[in-house]
Amino acid sequence: MGHKKNGHRRQIKERENQNKFERSTYTNNAKNNHTQTKDKKLRAGLKKIDEQYKKAVSSAAATDYLLPESNGYLEPENELEKTFKVQQSEIKSSVDVSTANKALDLSLKEFGPYHIKYAKNGTHLLITGRKGHVASMDWRKGQLRAELFLNETCHSATYLQNEQYFAVAQKKYTFIYDHEGTELHRLKQHIEARHLDFLPYHYLLVTAGETGWLKYHDVSTGQLVSELRTKAGPTMAMAQNPWNAVMHLGHSNGTVSLWSPSMPEPLVKLLSARGPVNSIAIDRSGYYMATTGADRSMKIWDIRNFKQLHSVESLPTPGTNVSISDTGLLALSRGPHVTLWKDALKLSGDSKPCFGSMGGNPHRNTPYMSHLFAGNKVENLGFVPFEDLLGVGHQTGITNLIVPGAGEANYDALELNPFETKKQRQEQEVRTLLNKLPADTITLDPNSIGSVDKRSSTIRLNAKDLAQTTMDANNKAKTNSDIPDVKPDVKGKNSGLRSFLRKKTQNVIDERKLRVQKQLDKEKNIRKRNHQIKQGLISEDHKDVIEEALSRFG
């Protein structure tokens, strides 16, 4: 890996923090042991790959020194002190003024309960009252961007590519509004939606709800990309995997299904509860999933191999919402209670979440923090990006809880910038549109896209098999040469266009399918006109003036 300088190879410096950047499969035996390889050219190539790998690991470890910010957690002064007993009032009095001011507490008792959703960069907050109150605001500056009183039931809302547009799931249809609250679109295809989400790299608005259908809508072109029937009744919970954009749906029979817009059937189905699934959360890396059900259970899954890490049975009350922060903190709401755990996503048995101090056992993962909304009920919760805050929407308003260590201390401003200007936001929108991924690229393993199919060599026919296939076809043609071809006078209805539309991909709506449907309608109109001419209803030179005027827009 090193460069030759003055006849010597430059040594690669090993870093103290290099271990956390090395692959787990890169063992000591694989580092330098290439003596068993007899091919000199292959051995030299393997050594070169090893040197490049060492250089990459050393460079990654060196850049870690340039990230001085670190996560700060609550630390007890002695073994008898428990962090979950610390109240929010004590934390506010101890932190700096700017952090204390971010502990938002809005009292909105008239239109609750409230559903909250933060923008991807954490700058804006979108609140949705069940009784029709919708508002978008810059919560850090205290500026209200848009406020709507829709006078009908609203269930959920989400921002689209940025805070300039947001979608609201209302009583029957889903609507899209701009940053001033002006209605832009009414999506008639999305009926009785209860859950909304947006895939930023594919520009897809995803909805699910009472109808049992999962629908993908491309907001850049306005086309309905796909509509999938879940066959599991109303959707109880929905979450997206940020790593591969696969949607996770929770159903009333206790199953969690994973969906891609290009597949009519779920990619994976797993049983997560003995009752309805109330909430689903997936961590930022896309490795772990947390679910909670009406059977008073909470389970944590490793979705790389779909194995269960931890299972907490017999919660005091059924969990209603679950969320995972960028740093791996797990938050659970049950009634008026909100409980958080640290290190709950680790594999060790000591990481299993539990309640209380468990008799002072130091090898138990007791709650990291807890909060009680007395006489209230939590509607939903979500961590604020890049902030040590947990947003909670409840029956009487919105509250931000200060949770030390919840936010990512070092962020990539080229990806998500919480301090972006108007010009940067516009450039970012253009950049994401140019780099928009097709809906067909959503799969369980995104690394498989562009790779070589190793099975193709075994599936491909060799020269001998091709010759035999050609010979069999010629012999069959000679044998049936005396059979005349039957050509009926009436054209059958089983045309190529109809057979294309009858394929199993009825749920996929693309440009080709729209062109085929348009061609079928055109042929149908021609046959209808010829029939009317034959019956003497119209003349051959008859022209429909209105139809010709509107045909230019077809």
From Swiss-Prot:
**Annotated localization:** Nucleus, Nucleolus
Keywords attached to this entry? Nucleus, Repeat, Ribonucleoprotein, Ribosome biogenesis, rRNA processing, WD repeat
Record region (Disordered): 1-39, 475-496
Q: Name one GO cellular component term.
A: 90S preribosome
Q: Name the residue ranges with Basic and acidic residues bias.
A: 13-23
Q: Where is the composition biased (Polar residues)?
A: 24-35
Query: Which residues fall in a compositionally biased region of kind Basic residues?
Result: 1-12
The main location class comes to: nucleus
What GO biological process terms are annotated to this protein in UniProt?
Answer: endonucleolytic cleavage in 5'-ETS of tricistronic rRNA transcript (SSU-rRNA, 5.8S rRNA, LSU-rRNA); endonucleolytic cleavage in ITS1 to separate SSU-rRNA from 5.8S rRNA and LSU-rRNA from tricistronic rRNA transcript (SSU-rRNA, 5.8S rRNA, LSU-rRNA); endonucleolytic cleavage to generate mature 5'-end of SSU-rRNA from (SSU-rRNA, 5.8S rRNA, LSU-rRNA); maturation of SSU-rRNA; maturation of SSU-rRNA from tricistronic rRNA transcript (SSU-rRNA, 5.8S rRNA, LSU-rRNA)
The UniProt entry, under Gene3D superfamilies, shows: YVTN repeat-like/Quinoprotein amine dehydrogenase
WD repeats mapped onto the chain: 108-149, 230-269, 272-311, 314-351
Top-level taxon of the source organism = Eukaryota
How this chain assembles, per its entry, is: Interacts with snoRNA U3. Interacts with MPP10. Component of the ribosomal small subunit (SSU) processome composed of at least 40 protein subunits and snoRNA U3.
Write out the function statement from the record.
Involved in nucleolar processing of pre-18S ribosomal RNA.
In terms of PANTHER family, this protein maps to: WD REPEAT-CONTAINING PROTEIN 46, WD-REPEAT PROTEIN BING4
Q: What is this protein called?
A: U3 small nucleolar RNA-associated protein 7
